Structure formats: structure tokens, C-alpha cells
Design a protein with these regions (language model features):
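Gly/Pro-enriched, hydrophobic low-complexity segments
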Residues: 62-69, 74, 120-173
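Repetitive helical segments and hydrophobic/amphipathic motifs
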Residues: 12-13
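Bacterial N-terminal signal peptides that target proteins for export
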Residues: 1-9
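N-terminal leader/targeting segments and the immediate start of mature chains
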Residues: 7, 16-60, 70, 97, ...
Length: 173
């Protein structure tokens, strides 16, 4: 009788430990890569935007758009505090104030700058996905990475913004 009680207690108290540890908070803080080149697909304000994103920390961010067709070929480049908008052979330098604050390129830039500044806070790891929280002017951003620190997804609460990155490569080689 006592043996059965011990087995039941063991199952009730030891088994949950194995089940709960599948997704846990890891104390080691894996560093997010802020220099990369990737393809992206972003749901932004009920619009699907695709293109290529390259970032080198806060030095250079380039967003080249493939779709929708109305913006295909448009490229937005942030070089420090300078902004360039280009399409085909036309390049226009502008002040960042000309881009609306909650626009797709500006939200993307602010999140990537926050990552480069080290403001993303590690929240946990589940299997091979690490999750970070980043407080921004647009609300709470959730950044997901693989186990090597390569960004795979960015979403922003309070904005209709969810970006999925694919074919992510290190910009440093």
C-alpha cells in the first residue's frame, strides 16, 4: 500500500518537472545579431509587404521592397541619421521627418536600432526559439530568434505589424 502511494506521489511531483522544463527561461543571454541580410514578409496594416532587409547595427539599414506592386523597386536606406529613398536610378536624400512616424520603414528602423542598442530583454527559450521583449515608441515588440541569435520574427503590439524573416545571413560574412 505504501509503495503504491510512493509511486503515485512520484508521478504527481516528478513527472511535471519533465513536462514543464520543455520551455524554460535560460539564464544565459544569447546575443541578438544586429548585422544581417534577409528576405522578409511583413503584414502591416492589412497589407502584405515583401522584400529584402539588410542591417549593420545603427550604421546602415536598407529596406528594398518587392511587393505590393505600387512600391516594387522602392528602397529606403537609413545611414546613421541620413535617409535615402531610391527607385531605379533616382535617389532622393531627405530628412527623417518626411517619413511618417508610424510608417513601415520607421517602425522597422526603430526596432532594429533598439536591438543594436542592446535594449532587447531576453524573456525565454523554448526548444530552438529565443524570445526577446523590446519596449519602443510604438509599443511592446516581441523579437524571436533561432538558437544562434538570427532574427526570425518581429511583431509589435499596438501596431498591425508582424515581420517574418527568411534566408537570414550574417552581414559580416
Amino acid at each position: 500500500m505504501t509503495r503504491k502511494i510512493l509511486i503515485v506521489l512520484c508521478v504527481l511531483f516528478v513527472m511535471p518537472v519533465f513536462v514543464i522544463t520543455g520551455c524554460d527561461e535560460v539564464q544565459e543571454n544569447l546575443s541578438l545579431k544586429s548585422s544581417f541580410i534577409a528576405d522578409f514578409s511583413c503584414e502591416y496594416r492589412k497589407m502584405n509587404i515583401t522584400g529584402k532587409l539588410s542591417a549593420s547595427g545603427k550604421k546602415l539599414i536598407n529596406i528594398s521592397l518587392d511587393s505590393p506592386n505600387t512600391v516594387s523597386g522602392l528602397s529606403v536606406t537609413y545611414k546613421g541619421s541620413d535617409l535615402e529613398i531610391s527607385r531605379e536610378n533616382m535617389i532622393c536624400s531627405a530628412d527623417e521627418a518626411y517619413i511618417p512616424e508610424s510608417s513601415f520603414p520607421n517602425i522597422t528602423k526603430e526596432i532594429l536600432y533598439g536591438i543594436a542598442d542592446g535594449r532587447a530583454v531576453f524573456e525565454g527559450k523554448c526548444e530552438d526559439v529565443c524570445t526577446y521583449r523590446l519596449d519602443s515608441a510604438f509599443g511592446k515588440a516581441v523579437v524571436s530568434t533561432n538558437s544562434k541569435g538570427c532574427i526570425s520574427k518581429i511583431s509589435v503590439d499596438g501596431e498591425d505589424y508582424e515581420m517574418v524573416l527568411s534566408d537570414v545571413k550574417d552581414a559580416n560574412g
